[in-house]
């Protein structure tokens, strides 16, 4: 791809744990025309030592957007939360394979049978080929470029090779999943991430919300920064 094509084809998914929840409706309505997905992190305080958003949040988000709601479950028992997310209106539900080793096929099937899309999230140390037994079922594979649990961590560049491996696997075997990167996507990393060929960029505090108090302005600034960084390749 030429750089301008990368820039035009880039899909951005704002991480809503980083938004200003005191301005919930205002910020969502400002992003509705631009966001490809809304990334909703649900943590249980056990799998990761943090507690963030919830199915109740999804239910309220669903009332004010048609943008696909993409849920990332960082929980030890995804089977308990998946039905709640489906009922709340989630479009895509992803979990960490380590939390579901004896029931991965059951959970992926449950999500698909509810008419939703399914995915898995790979931690920085989880290899790409670990998904090969069920890759044909996946709609999305998210690569964590930081260890999961907290916003604002340092980018782990070794994870970019995993994106390339996932894209190569997709091309070789005819899989249909999107690739997505989660963690520290911002002005410092856009160039190297875009070069990996990833489909979706999850943007949070440093990549989007801290750029301007007005989120519509912040979005414009993010797109300008992204275009500049990827054009300099």
Task: Give names to the regions the model predicted.
Residues 10-15, 38-40, 69-73, 93-95, ...:
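Hydrophobic faces of well-ordered beta-strands that scaffold small-molecule active sites
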Residues 40-110:
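N-terminal active-site wall of soluble small-molecule enzyme domains
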Residues 23, 91-178:
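Conserved anion-binding
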Residues 24, 31, 41, 85, ...:
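Conserved, mostly hydrophobic/aromatic
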Residues 208-233:
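C-terminal helical cap(s) of enzyme catalytic domains, especially alpha/beta-barrels
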Residues 33-34, 64, 88, 114, ...:
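Structural motif
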Residues 27-28, 79-87, 126-137, 184-201:
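Catalytic cores of alpha/beta
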Residues 38-54, 146-154, 209:
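Glycine-rich, proline-tolerant flexible connector loops at the mouths of alpha/beta enzymes
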């Amino acid at each position: 791809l030429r750089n301008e094509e990368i820039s035009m084809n880039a899909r951005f998914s704002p991480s809503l744990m980083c938004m200003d929840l005191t301005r919930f409706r205002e910020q969502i309505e400002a992003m509705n025309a631009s966001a490809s997905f809304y990334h909703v992190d649900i943590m249980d305080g056990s799998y990761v030592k943090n507690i963030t958003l919830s199915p109740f949040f999804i239910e309220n988000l669903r009332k004010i957007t048609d943008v696909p709601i993409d849920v990332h479950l960082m929980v030890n028992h995804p089977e308990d939360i998946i039905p709640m997310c489906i009922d709340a209106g989630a479009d895509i539900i992803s979990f960490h394979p380590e939390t579901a080793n004896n029931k991965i096929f059951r959970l992926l099937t449950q999500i698909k049978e509810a008419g939703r899309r399914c995915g898995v999230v790979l931690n920085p140390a989880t290899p790409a080929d670990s998904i090969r037994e069920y890759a044909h079922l996946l709609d999305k594979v998210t690569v964590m470029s930081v260890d999961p649990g907290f916003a604002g961590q340092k980018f782990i560049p070794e994870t970019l090779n995993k994106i390339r491996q996932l894209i190569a696997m997709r091309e070789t075997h005819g899989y249909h999943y999107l690739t997505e990167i989660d963690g520290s996507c911002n002005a410092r990393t856009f160039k190297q991430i875009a070069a990996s060929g990833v489909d979706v960029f999850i943007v949070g505090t440093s990549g989007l919300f801290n750029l301007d108090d007005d989120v519509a302005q912040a979005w414009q600034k993010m797109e300008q920064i992204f275009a500049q960084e990827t054009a300099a390749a």
